[in-house]
């Protein structure tokens, strides 16, 4: 397993729409393992393949405190959503920035697991929010897209400054 490089805004590769996975095979399972390794190394709770420049419909999530409840979503589809909620969201592709984003309180999805088996999942709370956030990535959407143009610009400037400082270090 290896840690992959996470793309940061304003990288346009984050805006690419991911393609469906045609076959869950050893290569896809390796990508899933690398994505978990990357997510844990970056201290995230979710990661979409597009964030690591792999433009396939793959998401990994672990919202558990002990980091031992791995969820793999391959080719996820939103079946239902209900209610309204929102929390301050962050994103590994938008480091050190957070903003309140409106989300559905509950979701029902269909996806394939890491072995290619189909399943359905009903989620609420943080898991539902994380699923929606990561599914947005698969269609090239970021949490800042829900914000005003002024807030988007401020966040972009902060991230670009942070990346410049990190490049010098």
From Swiss-Prot:
InterPro entries: Peptide_deformylase, Peptide_deformylase_sf
Active site, per annotation: 134
Gene3D superfamilies, A to Z: Peptide deformylase
EC number: 3.5.1.88
Cofactor mode of binding and number, as noted: Binds 1 Fe(2+) ion.
This protein's record includes keyword Iron: yes
Pfam families attached to this UniProt entry: Pep_deformylase
PANTHER family for the chain: PEPTIDE DEFORMYLASE
Role this protein plays: Removes the formyl group from the N-terminal Met of newly synthesized proteins. Requires at least a dipeptide for an efficient rate of reaction. N-terminal L-methionine is a prerequisite for activity but the enzyme has broad specificity at other positions.
Protein name, as recorded: Peptide deformylase
Organism of derivation: Salmonella typhi
Gene: def
């Amino acid at each position: 397993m290896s840690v992959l490089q996470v793309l940061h805004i304003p990288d346009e590769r984050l805006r690419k729409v991911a393609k469906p996975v045609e076959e869950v095979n050893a290569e896809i399972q390796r990508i899933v393992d690398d994505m978990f390794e990357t997510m844990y190394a970056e201290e995230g709770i979710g990661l979409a393949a597009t964030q690591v420049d792999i433009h396939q419909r793959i998401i990994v999530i672990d919202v558990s405190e002990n980091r031992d409840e791995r969820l793999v979503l391959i080719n996820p589809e939103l079946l239902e959503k209900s209610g309204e909620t929102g929390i301050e969201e962050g994103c590994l592709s938008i480091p050190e920035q957070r903003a309140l984003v409106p989300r559905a309180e509950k979701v029902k999805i269909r996806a394939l697991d890491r072995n290619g088996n189909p399943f359905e999942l009903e989620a609420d709370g943080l898991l539902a929010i994380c699923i929606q956030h990561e599914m947005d990535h698969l269609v090239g959407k970021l949490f800042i897209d829900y914000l005003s143009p002024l807030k988007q610009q401020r966040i972009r400037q902060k991230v670009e400054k942070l990346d410049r400082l990190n490049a010098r270090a």
